[in-house]
């Protein structure tokens, strides 16, 4: 079986799980390859039997392009990340959806695009000492 592990050309940091994942799949007989979603010279998803989206960290830089790539990929090969789930979690509001369902998540606050906010005050009001800031991405 030929498996693509979707990633991106420029990763913000090394992925410590990447090498063990590739080794485990290869040990089970899979022909596995990293496939950068944002590399026009990369093989097409149709060249693979299956694909899993793994470390496509830079999709916030081109959310429309990434969304279109996911749609094309789903038409060409079997995605192990179901397309409806991919669409749903492209926007960080999915964290609030999970929280409402009682699923533990990192405490989350969404800010409207362009909103003036004092992040230190927001964190202090919520009792947060550690903060992660990510783009929400519009659907």
State where each predicted segment sits.
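Short, surface-exposed alpha-helical segments at coil->helix boundaries
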Residues: 15-19, 63, 67, 92-95
């Amino acid at each position: 079986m030929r498996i693509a592990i979707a990633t991106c050309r420029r990763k913000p940091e090394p992925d410590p799980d990447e090498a063990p994942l590739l080794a485990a799949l290869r040990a089970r007989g899979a022909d596995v390859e990293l496939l950068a979603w944002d590399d026009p010279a990369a093989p097409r998803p149709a060249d693979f039997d299956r694909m899993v989206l793994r470390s496509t960290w830079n999709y916030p830089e081109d959310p429309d392009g990434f969304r279109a790539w996911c749609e094309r990929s789903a038409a060409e090969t079997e995605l192990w990340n179901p397309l409806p789930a991919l669409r749903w979690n492209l926007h960080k509001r999915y964290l609030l959806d999970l929280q409402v369902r009682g699923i533990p998540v990192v405490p989350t606050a969404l800010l409207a695009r362009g909103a003036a906010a004092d992040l230190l005050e927001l964190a202090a009001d919520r009792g947060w000492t550690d903060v992660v800031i990510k783009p929400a991405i519009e659907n």
